[in-house]
Design a protein with these regions (language model features):
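Hydrophobic ligand-binding cavity/cleft-lining segments
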Residues: 10-150
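Hydrophobic-ligand binding "helix-grip"
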Residues: 151-152, 156-193
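N-terminal signal peptide c-region/cleavage motif recognized by signal peptidases
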Residues: 3-5
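A short acidic/glycine-rich loop-to-helix N-cap element
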Residues: 181-185, 211-230
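Surface-exposed amphipathic alpha-helical segments
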Residues: 223-243
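A short hydrophobic beta-strand element
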Residues: 139-141, 166-174, 205-207
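A short, solvent-exposed beta-edge/loop patch
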Residues: 192-222
């Protein structure tokens, strides 16, 4: 299911920041993870692609308290048509995020992480619209999104997409403060990115999240765990939908 040794050179070229141990783990287990606290974004696992600079730029101005990175090596999805279009529309089918679950150690059971997720016509009117699927991959596109987060409740984000000949990306950033009893994460201080890069026989899926949070939530919540859960859930959602 995972990469074979013949793909090693491609991986090393695509992700030169990987150590030998990380490369071996990625080949054998299919994924690796990394996090930092109170450090700038490192993009340690970010693969080379035409969109990698866009991913970096999306975090400009952020001074994160916690950063999580994940990298998956997956089989290439089977599709009768354009693979990049299939990946792109999978990421644009934002309503399918509704009801995604994670295992809560605190409650020792499965919980819904994101619910009532939908695209909107504009940030002002906030009318629900159908998933804005496309027939070709544009270079850039964005639309507002509503979602209910298990901890932060009803929230508003902007979803941004980029397309290129070798990759597609999907980003989310909050457009209003997120509340945990009181506002704890200011507008645009929570940012996610997924980057999908087809290889010859596999698919690289990179994900990262950076959060700049207030003192209250940092005292009450272990940020690396909380936001690792969210970026992994986004990646798992894509994988489930794409395959």
């Amino acid at each position: 299911m995972w990469a074979n040794p013949s793909s090693a050179q491609t991986l090393q070229e695509r992700v030169p920041g990987l150590s030998a141990d990380e490369l071996q783990q990625l080949r054998s287990e299919g994924s690796i993870r990394f996090h930092t606290e109170d450090q700038p974004m490192q993009f340690r696992y970010l693969p080379h692609s035409s969109l990698s600079a866009r991913v970096r730029d999306s975090f400009r101005g952020l001074e994160p308290n916690a950063v999580n990175e994940v990298l998956y090596l997956l089989p290439k999805p089977h599709t009768d048509g354009d693979l990049l279009l299939h990946i792109y529309n999978t990421l644009r089918a934002i309503s399918t995020l509704s009801g995604v679950r994670y295992h809560s150690g605190h409650y020792d059971r499965e919980r819904v992480l994101f619910d009532d997720v939908y695209a909107m016509d504009s940030p002002r009117s906030r009318n629900r619209i159908d998933d804005p699927l496309v027939t070709r991959v544009p270079r850039e596109s964005s639309f507002p999104v509503h979602l209910v987060d298990a901890n932060f409740g009803s929230s508003y984000f902007e979803a941004t997409y980029y397309g290129a000949g070798d990759a597609v990306s999907f980003g989310l950033r909050n457009t209003q403060s997120l509340t945990y009893i009181i506002p704890v994460i200011r507008s645009e201080r929570l940012r996610f990115q997924l980057l999908a890069i087809p290889l010859e026989e596999e698919l690289l899926l990179y994900g990262t999240v950076g959060v700049e949070a207030g003192r209250l939530i940092r005292r009450q919540v272990h940020l690396p765990s909380a936001f690792r859960r969210r970026i992994e859930t986004l990646a798992d959602w894509f994988i489930e939908q794409a395959y």
